[in-house]
Amino acid sequence: MFQLRNFEAIKIGLASPEKIREWSRGEVKKPETINYRTLKPERDGLFCERIFGPTKDWECHCGKYKRVRYKGVVCDRCGVEVTRSKVRRERMGHIELAAPVAHIWYVKGIPSRMGLLLDMSPRALEKVLYFVSYVVIDPGDTPLTKKQLLSEKEYRDYLDKYGNRFRAGMGAEAIKELLQEIDLEKLSKELRAEIRESTGQKRVRAIRRLEVVQAFIDSGNRPEWMILDVIPVIPPDLRPMVQLDGGRFATSDLNDLYRRVINRNNRLKKLLDLGAPDIIVRNEKRMLQEAVDALIDNGRRGRPVTGPGNRPLKSLSDMLKGKQGRFRQNLLGKRVDYSGRSVIVVGPELKVYQCGLPKEMALELFKPFVMKKLVDEGLAQHIKSAKRMVEKVKPEVWDVLEEVIKEHPVLLNRAPTLHRLGIQAFEPVLVEGRAIKLHPLVCTAYNADFDGDQMAVHVPLSMEAQAEARFLMLAANNILKPQDGKPVMTPTQDMVLGCYYLTADEEGVPGEGKYFSSPEEAIMAYQLGYIHIHAKIKVKMTKEIDGVKKSKIIETTVGKIIFNEAIPQDLGYVDRTNPETAFDLEINDLVDKSKLGKILDRVYRLHGPTKTAETLDKIKELGFRYSTKAAITVSVSDMVIPKEKEKLLKEADEMVSKIESQFRRGLISEEERYESVIRTWNMTTEKVTEALMASLDKFNPIFMMAHSGARGSKNQIRQLAGMRGLMADPSGRIIELPIRSNFREGLNVLEFFISTHGARKGLADTALRTADSGYLTRRLVDVSQDVIVREDDCGADEGIYVEEIREGNEIIEKLADRIIGRVAAEDVIDNEGNIIVRRNELINEEEAEKIEKAGITKVRIRSLLTCKSRHGVCRMCYGRDLATGELVNIGEAVGIIAAQAIGEPGTQLTMRTFHTGGVAGADITQGLPRVEELFEARKPKGLAVISEISGVVRINESKKRREVIVTDEENNISKTYLIPYGSRLKVHDGQVIQAGDELTEGSVNPHDLLKIKGIFAVQTYLLQEVQKVYRLQGVEINDKHIEVIIRQMMRKVKVEDPGDTSMLPGELIDMFKFEDENKKAIEKGLRPATGRRALLGITKAALATDSFLSAASFQETTRVLTDAAIKGKVDPLLGLKENVIIGKLIPAGTGLSRYRNISVVKKVNDQQERQDKEKEETEVKASN
C-alpha cells in the first residue's frame, strides 16, 4: 500500500521509452472516443475500457460480469477487468509512434537543451527536425563534416558524387542517432579543458554546454530520451468527455490533440507499409512532429492549433501553467467540504471568542455529528432514520444541535486573506435568521465592515484540528498583530467615542464640587439624575493596605469611575506604593484611541490574553452604551467657519500679487515664482486650519470624533469648515489656484472641476495598488515559504549592530523599537560598567528603556542576517514571536508571517511618484513601487552616484560639466565621477568620505553597494530603505520580517573559479552547500572553489530554490520543469508548498516530526511510580 507519509523526497527525470511502456496498460490504436449509439467507449480508442478500466463500478463492457463478487475477474468476451471505475483516473495508455519525434520542451526551451548538447544552433536544429535540411550523421571519408547541414539540392549532388560513402538524414531520427553517439564523460572533459583555456563568448558557451552535459551525467538520464518513440496517454477521467443537455458532447481539448496524433501516426504507418515516395512520407512525419508538439505545448512553435471559434486548444503544458493550471488551481488550493458562507452582521452582545451561526447553516455543517448523537441518545434507530430526521428538521434535532456545537470551534475566514488573522476560530452560538454574527472587535483584523461583506465558515473535524483551532486560532488568543506586536483588537469608532465621552470633564455642570462617601454612591447619584457625568466631584476611596482599611478623598468624575470599573487597577500608571497616589484611579484622564491601545497593551503584558479579552468586552460594552447615551450627532451648524478666514485669504492674495510683480520685473524665475505661490497657499491653508481648530468647542461633535480617533481627521475637518486648499492636476503637478471654499460654503464650478482630478486619480490608484500589492505578497511568500524556526540556537557568534534609523534630522525608528524582543549578541554595558543585558538574553521593554536612558546609541543583537541554521532559522537569532510576546517556538513558519507582515499593509502604500515641488531632476520613487524595486534588487530610478574609494572630495565645475574627484592619498589612487545634469550634490569640497558613500542625492544601486562595501552594508541599506517607505506611511513593521526576506535574497553564492570541485563557473549555489563542497575538496587536498555572495531579487530567488515543485508552482512552470527533469532533481520537501502539493502535513507548527511522534502518558504519577519501582528492583538486584 502506497502511504503518503512513507517518502522523504520526490524525484523528477526524463522518461525512457521502456518506462512509458511500463506505465501503460495497453496501446491506443484508434482515434475513436465513444460509440454514438450505445454511448460506450470504443475498443482500442481513447476511452477504451480494456486499457483504462470499466466506466461503471464492478461491471465489464459487455455486461457478462456485474456485481462486486466478480472483483478482479477479467472478462473473457470483452477483456475488461471488473473493478472500481476510479481506476480510470490512474491507468495510462500509450501510442507507439511510427517515427521518432522530438520533445518540444527540450528543443524550444531557452536555452535549447538539445542544441547545447549537439552544439547546434536552435535554428539549425529546427531545420533538421522539421524536414527542411539534411544533417550529416557520418561523413565517412568525404570532405563533409559531422553535423553539417545540407539543403535538398546539396544532398542530391553529394549523393551523386560520393554514393554511399557518407550518411545524412533528417527529422528526429537523425537527431536521435546523433544524440546516441554522444560520449558524455569524454565531452565533459573536453569542455572543462576548453573553459580553462578560452575566454569571452566561447567560454560562456562552453560553460552553458558543460552545465547540460554534467546534468545528464549526474542524473543518469540519456540524451536520446529527449526524442520520443512512445507517447504516454493520460488517464481518460483526467480528460473527460461529458454529455450536455442537448445530447451534444463536451470534451477536453486534450482528446482533440491526441486524436490528431493518432490519425497522423496511423496514416504514416500505412504510407510506410505501402512504400510511398520519400517526399510524402517526409511530409507526414513533419505533420506528426507538429501534432505531438501541439499536444505537449500548443503555440510554443508556429501558430497554435485552434478549436471552434478560433480558440487555441489547451495542451498538456497549459494544464499545469498559470492560475488556472493544475498547480495553483487544484494542488495548492482546494475547495473543501463542511463549509458555508453568508453575509455578516454585527453582534455587539457576543464575547470576543464567540460568533453567531445561523441555525440552518449550523445544522447542515454539523449534520454527521447530529446524526450520530441522535442514534447515541436513542432518538433514532439507525443512521438512515437519523438522516431522515435531520432532513425533515424534527424539533428534537435542534436540542441535539445545541449540544453538538458546544465546545466545537468553527473557523471564520474573510477574503482577501492578507495575513494570518484573516482566519480565526470562534465558538458558535446559534442565531435566528440567515446571517453570521461577528464580534465588532475582530473587524480590524479581518478588515471587515457590515456593508454587505460575506464570510466563509469551516468546521474543523478531527480532535487535533479542534484542539489546534481552540489553542492557536481562537480569536481571544490572537490579540496581538504578528507585524509589530501591538494589539490588533483595539476598540474603534463608537466604542472609542463612548470611552472618550465617558472620561471627559466639563466646567459648570450640575453636581460640580459635591462630595460622595463612596464610588457606588456617586454612581447612584448620577443614575438618579442629581449630577452630570462630566461633573468634577470629590469621592472617598477606601482600600485595604497591609490588612488595614484606609481611605482618602480624590477628585474625579462619575464617568471616570465607571470607566475604571472595566480596567484592572494594577497597570502601573499609578504608583501604588506611594500613600499620596495609592488611592487614585488607574486612568484619571481623557481616553482616546491611542490611549486605549496602550492600556490594552499593558493589560496583555501583565495579565495575558484571557484577562485582556475580558477587559476588551467590558470596554466594548461601556463604549457602545455611552456613545448611545451621549447622543453625539452631526449637523451643518457644527461646522463652524473661523472668522479669521477672510482676513487670511486677503493676506495671501496680497502675497501672491507681490510674487507675481517680482516675477514680471524679472527678479525671480518662473520656477521660483511657482514654488513661492505654492508655499504661500500651503501656509495659508495651515493658518486657516489652526484658526478653525482653535474656534471649535471641545464638545463639538465633529471635533470630538476626530480628536478621540473615532472617525475623521484634522484634514477632513479642514475641508468641511476651513478651506480645501491646493489640488493636483492629472499629471500630479500642483495647480497654483487653490480651492478657497469649504464644503459647508460649497464649491463653485471651477473649484469642483479642479477637485475631480484628485478623486479620479485616487480611485484608479487604489485599483492598481490592490493588484500590485497582491502580486508582491505572492512573490514574498514564495521566496520565504521554507523559512521555519528549526532549532534552538545555531551558535552564531556574530550579530549586527543596530542604531536608530534617521531621514535627515527626523527619527524614523527609535533604537528601543529596534531592539525590543531581540536577543543580545554581547553583554550590553552602561557607562558605570553595569551589565543591563547579558549575551543571549532577550531584551524586553524595560531593558530597552534602560539602554536608551544610558545613552547607548548602538547595540549588537543576534540577527537572521547572520543566522547559521542551514534550513530555516534558529530561535535565538529570531527573538520574540510578536504575536505572543514570548521567545519564538520551534516550528513557527516565520517566513510566511514575514511575507504577510510586509504584504498586508502594501495596499496602504501610495503608488505615486512624488514630483519634488517642480525641481528639475530625477523623480524619487516612493510607496509600493519603491518597495518592489528594493526587493527585486533592481537598478533604481533616480540613481545616486556613489564613490568606490575612501578619500577626500574635490568638486570641479566647468560650464559644460560637473566632476567630483575623490582622492585616496594613502594608497595614491583617485577616481573622477561625472555628475549628471540636474543632480544635487550631497558632498562639499574637502569632505572626507568612505567607500560606498553617496555623492549625489537619489537611491543607491544595491549591486554596486555589494561590490564596494560588502554584504553587511547592502543588507543594512535594504532594511533601512524598506523601513523608510513603510514608516513614512505610518505603518509599523518589525525589522525581523524584512530580515527574513533579505536573508533569502542573499542565500546564494556565485561561483567564480570552481577550483577542483564539481561546481561550474557562474553557477548559483546555496552558500551552505558551497562551504560543504569546499570542505570536502580541502580534506582531499584539492583546490577549493572561490565565489562571491550574490544578491537576487525575490522573483529570481524564488525560482532558484532547491525545490522544483515550489518553483514550478510559482512562475515559468515549463522552464522550471524542463530544467529539473534534465538535472534529475530531487525535491527534499523541506518547504511548505511542496508538502501541500503532494498532500502531506506541512513541516511547520504541529506538523513537525518532533511534535507528531509523541506518545501520550496518562498520568505523571503512574510513570513516576513505574520508574521508582524499576529503580528499586535494580537496586535490589545490585545488592544481591
Swiss-Prot record:
Residue positions binding Zn(2+) 2: 794, 867, 874, 877
Broad enzyme group: transferase
Catalytic activity: RNA(n) + a ribonucleoside 5'-triphosphate = RNA(n+1) + diphosphate
EC number from the UniProt entry: 2.7.7.6
Disordered as annotated region, ranges: 1165-1184
GO molecular function, one term: DNA-directed RNA polymerase activity
Residues annotated as binding Mg(2+): 449, 451, 453
InterPro entries: DNA-dir_RpoC_beta_prime, DNA-dir_RpoC_beta_prime_bact, RNA_pol_asu, RNA_pol_N, RNA_pol_Rpb1_1, RNA_pol_Rpb1_3, RNA_pol_Rpb1_3_sf, RNA_pol_Rpb1_4
Sequence positions that bind Zn(2+) 1: 60, 62, 75, 78
Gene3D superfamilies xref list: 1.10.132.30, 1.10.150.390, 1.10.1790.20, 1.10.40.90, 2.40.40.20, 2.40.50.100, RNA polymerase II, clamp domain, RNA polymerase Rpb1, domain 3
Pfam name, any one: RNA_pol_Rpb1_3
Organism superkingdom: Bacteria
Alphabetically ordered keywords of this record: DNA-directed RNA polymerase, Magnesium, Metal-binding, Nucleotidyltransferase, Transcription, Transferase, Zinc
UniProt key word Transferase: yes
Cofactor dependence: Mg(2+); Zn(2+)
GO biological processes: DNA-templated transcription
Function: DNA-dependent RNA polymerase catalyzes the transcription of DNA into RNA using the four ribonucleoside triphosphates as substrates.
Family of the protein in this entry: Belongs to the RNA polymerase beta' chain family.
Protein name: DNA-directed RNA polymerase subunit beta'
